[in-house]
């Protein structure tokens, strides 16, 4: 009897910049897969999925899938990520908006 394993390599980093993670209170309203951009909800002071409309409001990228029951989120607070690997919201309708989502943070999109 033989066993066949399949390995799929997944490396979302776009270059050799270090990627660091952190944790913060979560305020998600639905399931969110890893690589979802996050922003700070100023009224609840919790991380939520980026709305896709506010330039420079994204502060991190979700590192581990989470949902509305997740009280703490693990997210990338720095690093360089490939444009095509980030799970952009539908409201982020053009490339410029996506590339400037993290303006002023330690996250770069290539």
From Swiss-Prot:
Highest taxon above the source species: Viruses
A Pfam family this chain is assigned to: HDPD
Keywords, in A-Z order: Capsid decoration protein, Capsid protein, Host cytoplasm, Late protein, Viral capsid assembly, Viral release from host cell, Virion
GO cellular component, one term: host cell cytoplasm
Region Disordered, residue ranges: 1-28
Principal cellular location given in the protein's record: virion
Polar residues bias locations: 1-18
GO biological process terms, semicolon-separated: viral DNA genome packaging
Record's subcellular location: Virion; Host cytoplasm
Function: Stabilizes the expansion of the capsid head shell after genome packaging. The packaging of viral genome in the procapsid triggers a dramatic reconfiguration of the capsid shell, expanding from roughly 50nm to 60nm while the capsid thickness decreases. 415 capsid decoration protein molecules cooperatively bind the expanded capsid, thereby stabilizing the mature capsid shell.
Family: Belongs to the lambda phage gpD family.
Record's subunit section: Homotrimer. Interacts with major capsid protein.
UniProt protein name: Capsid decoration protein
Organism: Escherichia phage lambda (Bacteriophage lambda)
Gene name of the record: D
């Amino acid at each position: 009897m033989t066993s066949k394993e399949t390995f799929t390599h997944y490396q979302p980093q776009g270059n050799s910049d270090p990627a660091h993670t952190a944790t913060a209170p979560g305020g998600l309203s639905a399931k969110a897969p890893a690589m979802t951009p996050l922003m700070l909800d100023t009224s609840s002071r919790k991380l939520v999925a980026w709305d896709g409309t506010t330039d420079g409001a994204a502060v991190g990228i979700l590192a581990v899938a989470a949902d509305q029951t997740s009280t703490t989120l693990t997210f990338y607070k720095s690093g360089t990520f490939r444009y095509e690997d980030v799970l952009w919201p539908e409201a982020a309708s053009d490339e410029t908006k996506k590339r400037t989502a993290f303006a002023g943070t330690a996250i770069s999109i290539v």
